[in-house]
Amino acid sequence: MAVTVETLEKLERKITLSLPLNSIQSEVENRLKQVARTVKMDGFRPGKVPMSVVAQRYGYSVQYEVLNDKVGEAFAQAVNEAKLRVAGQPRISEKEGAPEGEAQFEAIFEVMPEVKIGDLTSAEVEKLTAEVDDAAIDKTVDILRKQRRTFAQRAQADVAVDGDRVTVDFEGKIDGETFSGGKAEDFQFLVGEGQMLKEFEDAVRGMKAGESKTFPLAFPADYHGKDVAGKTADFLVTVKKIEAANLPEVDEAFAKALGVAEGTVEGLRADIKKNLEREVKFRVQGRNKQAVMDALVSKAELELPKASVQAEVARLLEGARAELQQRGIKDAEKAEIPEDVFLPQAERRVRLGLVVAELVRANELHATPDQIKAHVEELAASYEKPEDVARWYFGDRQRLAEVEAVVIENNVTEFVLGKAKVSDKAVSFDELMGQA
């Protein structure tokens, strides 16, 4: 088939598809005969329905089905012969004035763009490094102790201090009216750990069991409760009980309780360091990967297929609606969400996907079976039964595809870091974890 491709603009192309009418009619007749063999109609025995009746009942739908198939096959053959890589679905319409004995259709579509990676040797990338020090291990030990703390009631004369667990009754009013969520009895929280708004904690800190206090509380403008956000409430709080925290000693019993095989404090700290180093490795890889992807996007030159961007916007919009549903938002599927909100993110995702795909193709950065196996084993290593976790990954193609994608991104990251102008930057454990 001779294929003529017309360029409309940038990535948009048009192809005219010609189909012999006798070929279409022959296929319609064949399919109607197949329908006639199995169709059941009142007044006729199976397989004995006259073709005229079958054609009257099913002719339109069969013809529509045949046209769809024939046009789809012709389009696939045409773009294959023209060596075109199509982006998105074509818009196909019937063309008027076709030669006798033919049906003609116009297919308008976009092609995948030429991707120019750019000069990676001029790209500047900041590469992070981080170490697990004793302070990070100490902080993790403190967290583990807090997770296993017990509480004992304080003496009547004692006041509430940071770290104490308090039991309170409270009631808040705005303009003299109690609001939703503003009243509770026997409510417990830990003082000084950010579980309540700062003004609430400040009011309770220093109170004794049995005491009551009134105080104003200004809700932040971005408070999650929209009915009270930006407003000031008058609260009455009564402290009913104050309990002091008792932290377990860091000893052999503590280590054994945490599943340390040899049951020593040294073994516990070694296990913690190993786990933290694994987490640091993944965090550093993630941050460095992001820096590399930013550099790739900034250096690359390409046109974005509108169809691909629109498809990505639709995916992001669907994800946003699903998140709203998970939050319990009523009629989330009908919520009016402007699509242009997602446009910058969609364009970046499409751009990055095309650039990475071209870099992988041009430099053979595909994931090898050994790399995939090694990454699965690394992911599984942090679990109690790594063999079971590894089998879980290898037992599902979708999960393995996700691992493969990560490995490819790692290959791309290492490749770019080997070409770019890299400056090393050491960060602390807390900075890396966002705790500084």
UniProtKB/Swiss-Prot annotation:
<comment type="similarity">
    <text>Belongs to the FKBP-type PPIase family. Tig subfamily.</text>
</comment>
<dbReference type="GO" id="GO:0005737">
    <property type="term" value="C:cytoplasm"/>
</dbReference>
<dbReference type="GO" id="GO:0003755">
    <property type="term" value="F:peptidyl-prolyl cis-trans isomerase activity"/>
</dbReference>
<feature type="domain" description="PPIase FKBP-type">
    <location>
        <begin position="163"/>
        <end position="248"/>
    </location>
</feature>
<dbReference type="GO" id="GO:0061077">
    <property type="term" value="P:chaperone-mediated protein folding"/>
</dbReference>
<keyword id="KW-0963">Cytoplasm</keyword>
<keyword id="KW-0131">Cell cycle</keyword>
<dbReference type="Pfam" id="PF05698">
    <property type="entry name" value="Trigger_C"/>
</dbReference>
<dbReference type="InterPro" id="IPR008880">
    <property type="entry name" value="Trigger_fac_C"/>
</dbReference>
<dbReference type="Pfam" id="PF00254">
    <property type="entry name" value="FKBP_C"/>
</dbReference>
<dbReference type="InterPro" id="IPR027304">
    <property type="entry name" value="Trigger_fact/SurA_dom_sf"/>
</dbReference>
<dbReference type="InterPro" id="IPR008881">
    <property type="entry name" value="Trigger_fac_ribosome-bd_bac"/>
</dbReference>
<protein>
    <recommendedName>
        <fullName>Trigger factor</fullName>
        <ecNumber>5.2.1.8</ecNumber>
    </recommendedName>
</protein>
<comment type="function">
    <text>Involved in protein export. Acts as a chaperone by maintaining the newly synthesized protein in an open conformation. Functions as a peptidyl-prolyl cis-trans isomerase.</text>
</comment>
<dbReference type="InterPro" id="IPR001179">
    <property type="entry name" value="PPIase_FKBP_dom"/>
</dbReference>
<dbReference type="GO" id="GO:0044183">
    <property type="term" value="F:protein folding chaperone"/>
</dbReference>
<dbReference type="InterPro" id="IPR036611">
    <property type="entry name" value="Trigger_fac_ribosome-bd_sf"/>
</dbReference>
<dbReference type="GO" id="GO:0051083">
    <property type="term" value="P:'de novo' cotranslational protein folding"/>
</dbReference>
<dbReference type="GO" id="GO:0043335">
    <property type="term" value="P:protein unfolding"/>
</dbReference>
<dbReference type="GO" id="GO:0015031">
    <property type="term" value="P:protein transport"/>
</dbReference>
<dbReference type="InterPro" id="IPR037041">
    <property type="entry name" value="Trigger_fac_C_sf"/>
</dbReference>
<dbReference type="Pfam" id="PF05697">
    <property type="entry name" value="Trigger_N"/>
</dbReference>
<keyword id="KW-0413">Isomerase</keyword>
<dbReference type="InterPro" id="IPR046357">
    <property type="entry name" value="PPIase_dom_sf"/>
</dbReference>
<dbReference type="InterPro" id="IPR005215">
    <property type="entry name" value="Trig_fac"/>
</dbReference>
<keyword id="KW-0697">Rotamase</keyword>
<dbReference type="GO" id="GO:0043022">
    <property type="term" value="F:ribosome binding"/>
</dbReference>
<dbReference type="GO" id="GO:0051301">
    <property type="term" value="P:cell division"/>
</dbReference>
<keyword id="KW-0132">Cell division</keyword>
<keyword id="KW-0143">Chaperone</keyword>
